[in-house]
Amino acid sequence: MTRPPRVDRRHWPALRDAFASLPADSRVFDWQAAFPEVMAQGGFDIVVGNPPYVRQAALGPFKPYLAARYASYHGVADLYVYFYERGLELLAPQGKLSYIVTNKWLRAGYGEPLRRLFAERAEIEEILDFGHAPIFEDADTFPCILIARHRPPEPRPEPSLVRVCPVPRDRPAELSLDNYVHEHGYPVPWSRYGAEPWSLESPEVETLMGRLRERGVPLAEFVGVKPMYGIKTGLNEAFLIDETTRAELIRQDPGCADVIKPYLRGQDIKRWAPDWQGLWMIVLKSSLNFAWPWQESGDQAEAVFARTYPSLHGHMKGMEERLRARQDQGRYWWELRSCDYYGIFDEPKIIHTDIAWYPQFAYSDGPLYFVNTCYIWPTADLFALAAMNSPVMWAYMWRHAQHGKDEALRLFNSFTTTLPIADPTPEIRREVEERAAAALELTRLTQRESGELLTWLRLELGVEKPGQRLETFADLTGEAFAAEVCKRRPKGAPRLTPRTLTELTDTHRRYATAAQARAAQRRALERRMSDLVIQAYQLTDAEIDLLWRTAPPRMPGAR
C-alpha cells in the first residue's frame, strides 16, 4: 500500500483551483487537492463508509489499473475491496476506519490480499457479522461492520484482542447494537487474523474446530481420490432430454440407446441416495476421448455421424448454430467437450451439489450423469459418506465454507478436499458402513414407493406436476393429501367421487405409514452413526456438549 506524497503548502491554492475547474461530470477525485490541509497532517482521523457493491465482472476495463495500483488486487475481487485499501491510505497514523460491506472477503479466496493488507497495516478492533440479516432492503449482501486502526508498517505489537460479535439474523433493527455487542461480543486473539480465511468463532469453538482438523485427514487424502466436475454441455437443451424424447429417438434408431444415459439434476441429489426422475443425457463424447466411427473422417465426419445415429443427428441439426457457438464442445459441433474421466459416471461414487442447504451427500453404484453444478467422488467408501453427512461435519462446514444466498453453503472442490475426516478404528468403520448401507436401502425404498404413488396420481388422476407437498406426502394428513391432489388436477377435471376420495386417502395411509416407519428407522441409524463418527474424532464429553450447544442452523439430528 503506497501512501500519496504530501504536497507543499504553497501549492494548495493552485491545486484547489485546478480541482474546481474540472467538469461537473468528471470521475476524477484528488484527495490531495480536495483536502490539502488534512493530507498535510498525515490523513483523516476517521474514515466511515458504505462502499458500493459492484461485482468484479463489471470491472473488466479497470482491472489493469487496479492490479497496478492496489496491493489488495485479486482478479475476481469486487469493488469494495479497493475501497478498503483506499480508506486505509487516507487515514492518519492511529486513525480509525469503519465500513459496512459484505462479509464474503473474510473467507473467500479473493479476499486473501486484503486480509494480508489488514494484518500488515492495521489493527482490527471490532468485527460485527450480521450474516443473512436483511440490513438493506432488496439486497442480500451478508453485511459485516469492521473497525480498524491504521498503524505504520512495522512488526505487530504485543498480542492484542479483537472484539467479535455475530448479530442475530432475526429482527436486527430492534436491537440496541451497542448493548448487544457489550453483552454478547467476545475477545479473539488478533494473531488469528492473517492472510488465511478469518474465523469469527469464539475461542472455545475455534479450539474445537482445531481438534477436528488435528484428528482428521483431508477428505481427498482419506478416500485417495479428488472430486470431479459434472459435464459442461454448453447447451443443455441439446443434450438433456426427457423420457418422451428419448423414446422417440430410440424408436427412430434403436442403435442410439447406448449413448443416452440416466441424468440427475442437482435437485435430485438427496441425502444418502439420488432420486432419479427419468431424465436423460445424450453422451456424445468428444472424438478426442472416444473412437467414434467419424473420429478421423474430416469433412465427411457429419455424414458418418448421420449414418451412425440418424435420429441423434436430426435432433442436433436443428440446434447446429448454437452448438457451433459453444465454448465447451468436442472436436465436432455435435460432441461434448473433451473429458478424460467419463468412466467415473458409470462407477460407484459419492455425489453432491455445489450448493448445500443441508448435508445431502449421496451414493450411487450405477450409471448416472450430471452437469457441472455437481461433484463426483469416485469412491465406494461408506464411512466417508456417513462422515460427510454427519452433524459434526456440518458444524465444521458451516464455519468454514463460503456462504451463499439464504445461507446455503458453497461446496467447491477447493474446500471439500480439505474436510477433516477422522480415521476410524476397524470396529467403528464396520459398524458405520453397515448402518450407512441400511440407510441407503431405506432411502431407496422410500424413493421407489414415492415414485409409484406419484405415477399412480399421474395416470389415474391426471396430476402431471405434483409439487413439493405431494412429493413429501408422508408429512401430510390424509385430508391434506386429498385436498392437494384435487388442487393439482387439470382445470376442468370432474370432481372426485366419494369412492375415489376414500381410495385416495386409503392409498395415502398405506404409503405414508410405511414411509414414516422407514424415516424413523433411518433417524435411529443416523443417530448411531453420528455417535460413532464423533467417537472416531475422540471428542471429550465437554467437546461433544459444546458441539451441540453451538450447533449451526439445520444441523442434522439436532438435539
What are these regions (language model features)?
Residues 1-33, 40-46, 58:
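Basic, amphipathic N-terminal segments
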Residues 30-254, 258, 361-374, 385, ...:
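Signature of N6-adenine DNA methyltransferases within the class I
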Residues 51, 55, 91, 95, ...:
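A generic secondary-structure signal for well-formed alpha-helical elements
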Residues 130-135, 336-340, 404:
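Short, solvent-exposed loop/turn elements at beta->coil junctions and helix N-caps
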Residues 145-147, 263, 351, 376, ...:
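Conserved hydrophobic/aromatic beta-strand scaffold that supports enzyme active sites
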Residues 191-199, 213-223, 311, 422-559:
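Non-catalytic DNA-recognition/assembly elements of restriction-modification systems
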Residues 192-379:
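Polyanion-binding catalytic cores of nucleic-acid enzymes and NTP/SAM-utilizing transferases
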Residues 375-418, 425-428, 433, 437-442, ...:
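Basic, amphipathic alpha-helical recognition segments used for DNA target recognition
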